Amino acid sequence: MRAYLSDRMGAALLMAPLLLFLVLAYAWPFLGVVKWSFTLPTPGLGQYNALLTDQLVQSVFIRTLRIAAIVTIVSVVAAYAITVVWVRGTPVQRVVAEFCILVPFWISVLTRAFGWVALLSNRGLINTWLQAVGFISEPLALVRNEFGVIVGMTHFLIPFAVFPLASSMRGLDDRVLLAARGLGSSRMRTFWSVFVPMTSSGIIGSALIVFVFSLGFFVTPAILGGGRSVMIAELIYLRIFQSPDWGLGAAISVVLVLFVGALMALLFRYIRPKQLV
């Protein structure tokens, strides 16, 4: 018992500096934001009432949720395919998959966003090639809209969806899959009826991680959306630095943080923190 308490005390002492940093760097400033949401420009609940009546704010919230949902579905599906190859493929396939997973981390989000602008713009590589081969006569609108935002965000978030899936797949007992095959199940049926259900915790974890990250995206929607597909993080920036309407911007921030906090609590009901690494 003493050894157990000693270990717990040692762990608490090691975590104390980090917890202090989090309180000073995040919790304390956030309390200031909460205060602004109730006091600027006048004390009261006026800013939160505005969230329920301002059609612009409501449309941005809906757009953010819609884009986040689409990005989550596409990212998890793509990440699942990549993870299957990474975990259960041949050595060469694993190297290629690992390369695809790690390379995006070497490039900044700003560089990637401008790279997609170069690819998707009217005179970009994709439109130029499609016109050259005769598939289209006029350039397609692939950027400065929701499509461009979804492409850029999906490209950024796929690697983050891989790790919970990989942890879930590595924990599978191959004997269960062999038993299914031995009972006459085809490869495809074994995959959909046995393999996929057994990795459901990884799917849920990946989906929640991607969805939470999507809600707070700023740089990618600002560049690829071109001001036409404003998401909630960009709206907060505009309200605080351009309007300026600090009270409403603070209220939107508080609602976003509480919503993300609820999603994170839901996340850790389905996946252990160690599964994320």
Which functions belong to the PLM regions below?
Residues 183-184, 197:
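Glycine/proline-centered hinge or cleavage motifs at structural transition points of membrane proteins
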Residues 7-41, 55-170, 194-198, 202-218, ...:
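Membrane-water interface segments at the C-terminal ends of transmembrane alpha-helices
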Residues 42-53, 227-239:
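Short hydrophobic, aromatic-rich alpha-helical segments embedded in or entering the lipid bilayer
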Residues 270-277:
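Short cytosolic juxtamembrane segments of multi-pass membrane proteins
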Residues 180:
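The alpha-helix within a helix-turn-helix
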Residues 172-176:
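Active-site loop immediately N-terminal to the catalytic Tyr-X3-Lys motif
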